[in-house]
């Protein structure tokens, strides 16, 4: 039934996140712990060119949907949806360009590159009234998802998460191939500040910063969401070291 389908889909996501998304060898302990570093396991490979599919008509969806990368049926492939925040109606062409550039960049990293034929990527052209991002205790921007900066992290405010969930449901019911579901959502904030976050398996965030111009930050944050990975930084050691060289 529906519950079993969701369970199978989650297993597929875990397989992508743990056994497919990380091509370097693991120790048995690292595999069991599921705490591998997103920094550590994302390995750059030679550049591959992604062929974008022509936009499909989406008259039944609230916002236009742009097909960035589709290689097979949505039910069989892992579906990534990119949504914009802080992009006004006049900036939608820029959003599509930004989302496409970052998604194509992500598909040049292993093992996304090797499994690119099992991944479909779409962009939903959500429209904000104002450009930019709000700051906790500071400026307020009227953006669609009401994203807000909390120090170096990004999060929802004022019900923005429910808006994203509603758009996911709409995609699943009215746009994707029959029986398909969205695997994860990445929200791209129209600000040049260098921020990012992943709050669970469904949502991750990055910005339109120079460091993220080729999707490096997006790849990092999406890997947190799909693989359930923890950071391993010399300056940030609250996660256990689970590298292949650790005891």
Residue spans for each PLM region:
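Bacterial N-terminal signal peptides that target proteins for export
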Residues: 4-15
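The catalytic-center signature of Zn2+-dependent metalloproteases
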Residues: 200-247
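Gram-negative bacterial Sec-dependent N-terminal signal peptides
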Residues: 14-22
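Short, well-ordered secondary-structure micro-motifs within conserved domains or adaptor modules
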Residues: 179-193
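Short, surface-exposed beta-strand/loop "edge" segments at domain boundaries and coil↔beta transitions
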Residues: 24-26, 89, 192-201
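Sec-dependent signal peptide cleavage junction
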Residues: 21-38
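Structural recognition of the beta-strand scaffold that forms the well-ordered cores
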Residues: 79-84, 120-123, 184-188, 217, ...
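Propeptide-to-catalytic entry region of secreted or membrane-anchored zinc metalloproteases
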Residues: 37-177, 191, 209
